[in-house]
């Protein structure tokens, strides 16, 4: 009995260690408008009373990762047992979206990858296994001259745990799922060691583009032994193959990471509700930082907003 209790305790401790220091996207900012994400600390316990948000929901309250064993599971699409957000937010093609993470551990080096998948007729009722994702951003190794190097997520940390991604100007208007992901490689030197942290948001893209890029279903984005999944970061790195399909030809590369000034707080829309077109703009300022008087402060203490002390990081070209 003592042996069983000790084994159970060890398992519990290992599980706690696994999920203790990871993260999730707490909010997004589009053209200065702050939109709350899925709050893992409260929403799962609120049932139908949880606010309507564009973020996909997940019972993963421990902030834990997905493993390569999950790549063929629907969990890899938008995280563990994720269901579509009930709302959506509007964005103009060519605008930039700032995604705010909870503090990301500095040891978890790896790429930042973003995808879009078109939803028809909308994203709130979409079958996630039918979504076909095309890559619009992928930043891997930025500077490999020292070990373990400077990676995409190191730029995210430097930029107050935020990431800017640009919605391609050339895509056709309509409803899309934005799939944003960090892949931690600190244990990826052997098979099964990579850690994936996907988050999804429902968008309605406005514009006059016509492209409808072909995509890949989420369960076929990666393989456990694919390029960039098994990778030893504890060596001098001259190049790195960002996992996933080839970058969409219309994607904006080399987006300079910068904080987004918050000017107001927005609420996700639902299909059929009156909508307004977001103001034109890049959605980010390389020098402006949020001030305490610039916007209504979100009431949830768990929803982090970009810090005024975050400095813009250097530009990094998207890797293929």
Curated annotation (Swiss-Prot):
It comes from the Eukaryota. Glycans are attached at residues 81, 160. Lignocellulose is the most abundant polymeric composite on Earth and is a recalcitrant but promising renewable substrate for industrial biotechnology applications. Together with cellobiose dehydrogenases (CDHs) an enzymatic system capable of oxidative cellulose cleavage is formed, which increases the efficiency of cellulases and put LPMOs at focus of biofuel research. Disulfide bonds join 78-200, 119-123. One of its GO terms (molecular function) is metal ion binding. GO terms for cellular component: extracellular region. Binds 1 copper ion per subunit. InterPro entries: AA9, AA9_LPMO. One of its GO terms (biological process) is cellulose catabolic process. Cu(2+) binds at residues 22, 108, 197. Its EC number is 1.14.99.56. It holds the Pfam family AA9. Induction: Expression is up-regulated on steam-exploded bagasse as carbon source compared to glucose. Residues 1-21 form the signal peptide. It is found in: Secreted. Keywords: Carbohydrate metabolism, Cellulose degradation, Copper, Disulfide bond, Glycoprotein, Metal-binding, Monooxygenase, Oxidoreductase, Polysaccharide degradation, Secreted, Signal. Its main location: secreted. PANTHER family: ENDO-BETA-1,4-GLUCANASE D, PUTATIVE (AFU_ORTHOLOGUE AFUA_1G12560)-RELATED. This is AA9 family lytic polysaccharide monooxygenase F. The lineage of its organism: Eukaryota, Fungi, Dikarya, Ascomycota, Pezizomycotina.
């Amino acid at each position: 009995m003592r042996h069983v209790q000790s084994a159970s305790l060890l398992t519990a401790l290992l599980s706690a260690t696994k999920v203790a220091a990871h993260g999730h996207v707490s909010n997004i900012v589009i053209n200065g408008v702050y939109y709350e994400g899925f709050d893992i600390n409260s929403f799962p316990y609120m049932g139908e009373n949880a606010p309507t948000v564009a973020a996909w929901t997940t019972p993963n309250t421990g902030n834990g990762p997905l493993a390569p064993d999950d790549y063929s599971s629907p969990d890899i699409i938008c995280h563990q047992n994720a269901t579509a957000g009930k709302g959506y937010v509007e964005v103009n093609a060519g605008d930039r979206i700032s995604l705010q993470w909870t503090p990301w551990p500095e040891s978890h080096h790896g790429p930042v990858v973003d995808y879009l998948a078109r939803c028809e007729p909308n994203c709130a009722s979409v079958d996630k296994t039918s979504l076909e994702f095309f890559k619009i951003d992928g930043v891997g190794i930025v500077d490999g001259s020292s070990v373990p190097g400077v990676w995409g997520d190191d730029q995210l940390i430097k930029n107050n745990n935020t990431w800017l991604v640009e919605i391609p100007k050339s895509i056709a208007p309509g409803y899309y799922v934005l799939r944003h992901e960090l892949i931690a490689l600190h244990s990826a030197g052997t098979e099964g060691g990579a850690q994936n942290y996907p988050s999804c948001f429902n968008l309605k893209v406005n514009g006059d583009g016509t492209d409808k890029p072909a995509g890949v279903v989420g369960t076929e984005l990666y393989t456990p032994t694919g390029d960039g999944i098994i990778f030893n970061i504890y060596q001098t790195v001259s190049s790195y193959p960002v996992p996933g399909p080839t970058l969409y030809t219309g994607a904006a590369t080399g987006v300079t990471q910068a904080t987004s000034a918050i000017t107001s707080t927005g609420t996700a829309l639902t299909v059929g509700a009156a909508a307004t077109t977001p103001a034109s703009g890049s959605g980010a300022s390389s020098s402006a930082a949020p001030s305490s008087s610039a916007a209504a402060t979100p009431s949830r203490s768990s929803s982090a907003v970009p810090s005024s002390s975050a400095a813009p990081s250097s530009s990094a070209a998207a890797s293929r």
